[in-house]
Amino acid sequence: MSEMSVVEYEVVSKNLTSKMSHELLFSVKKRWFVKPFRHDRQLGKLHYKLLPGNYIKFGLYVLKNQDYARFEIAWVHVDKDGKIEERTVYSIETYWHIFIDIENDLNCPYVLAKFIEMRPEFHKTAWVEESNYSIAEDDIQMVESIKRYLERKIASD
């Protein structure tokens, strides 16, 4: 029986004067955001140790001075040999002032609101909240509900 390998994976997490990059991993198995094992404030990175499995990477990239925001969802697969495959499945661009208000919208999917809420503070990295519960919907339903919500939200504004 082969031993499962743990893989190190890093994402960007920084909030500077004019731009912000915010990425977090979501565990498909545990149905909640993965807690990073290390925060690197100097480089603006979060470091994860991942077991083989499937993850969803949420990404938010902002140019504050230009009122621009891009949100992405990517599937991340770690195989038993430690090889990582990543594929972007959704991307949308909008105004930053619209996106920042989403976390206060009662119609916003819970996971999206939590992702926005956990964005990094000024000159810090994001802090992932631990949770004693997981979301009820499966990964595909969750991604589809986020996509539908954002398409409606951005079309209406």
UniProtKB/Swiss-Prot annotation:
S-S bonds: none
UniProt xrefs under InterPro entries: DUF3258
Domain of life (superkingdom): Viruses
Pfam family of the protein (one): DUF3258
Name by which UniProt lists this protein: Uncharacterized protein ORF157
